[in-house]
């Protein structure tokens, strides 16, 4: 596959949208069934990803946000992490997209930013997840859905222990510029992205477009490409 980094600051790259809603309409439960579908019904996952390709996206994002050891252990699937990783990347690679990104979300473990043991435990979650994808055909990792700078820092450190691939990092930001945890600002997350070697600085917001553009300009102060995600809330006046 082409080196995605050669396209940074040159091309506008569009990432695929989450396929979980598509799978949910087919009867899959979002909590656990997505991993099941990846293994047992890969055709359903491939069909959902194919819809994104038909829409013209350049980057297919694997349905792997919940594939950290702690989250898989909660579903009794921790030992199947390597198998799940291979299946997820295979589903995307079969469609021959321009690029494949592996998504990892927050690991879900409690995090005490003042405790070295807690930080190491969280960091290890992401390192172990990244190791499961070693040797597979991917162009980078996508750290998505993070709500605190400390959690994001652990994720970045964990990935950098294992991989030199590009890392897209994204945090959830409110209209007021605060992260979803309500205690830290977007600027703190950007500082962490710069310090811990993110390749792309990103955010996801439900804010109006004008406010989202302000967040994008804030992120653009870093010497990194900017990833903007708009979380469009369903409008049902009834």
Language-model features, listed with the residues they occupy:
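Domain-level signal for soluble alpha/beta catalytic cores
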Residues: 1-238
């Amino acid at each position: 596959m082409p080196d995605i980094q050669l396209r940074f600051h040159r091309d506008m790259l569009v990432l695929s949208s989450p396929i979980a809603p598509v799978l949910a309409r087919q009867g899959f439960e979002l909590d656990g069934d997505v991993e099941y579908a990846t293994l047992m019904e890969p055709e359903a996952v491939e069909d959902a990803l194919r819809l994104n390709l038909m829409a013209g996206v350049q980057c297919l994002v694997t349905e792997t946000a919940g594939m950290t050891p702690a989250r898989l252990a909660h579903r009794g699937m921790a030992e199947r992490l390597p198998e799940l990783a291979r299946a997820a990347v295979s589903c995307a690679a079969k469609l021959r997209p321009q690029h494949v990104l592996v998504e990892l979300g927050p690991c879900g473990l409690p995090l005490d930013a003042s405790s070295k043991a807690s930080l190491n435990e969280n960091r290890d979650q992401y390192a172990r997840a990244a190791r499961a994808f070693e040797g597979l055909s991917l162009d980078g990792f996508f750290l998505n859905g993070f709500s605190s700078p400390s959690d994001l820092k652990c994720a970045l450190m964990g990935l950098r222990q294992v991989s030199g691939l590009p890392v897209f990092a994204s945090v959830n930001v409110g209209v007021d510029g605060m992260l979803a945890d309500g205690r830290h600002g977007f600027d703190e997350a950007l500082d962490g992205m710069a310090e811990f070697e993110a390749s792309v600085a990103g955010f996801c917001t439900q804010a109006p477009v004008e406010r989202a553009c302000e967040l994008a300009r804030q992120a653009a102060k870093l010497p990194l490409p900017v990833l903007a995600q708009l979380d469009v809330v369903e409008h049902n006046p009834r």
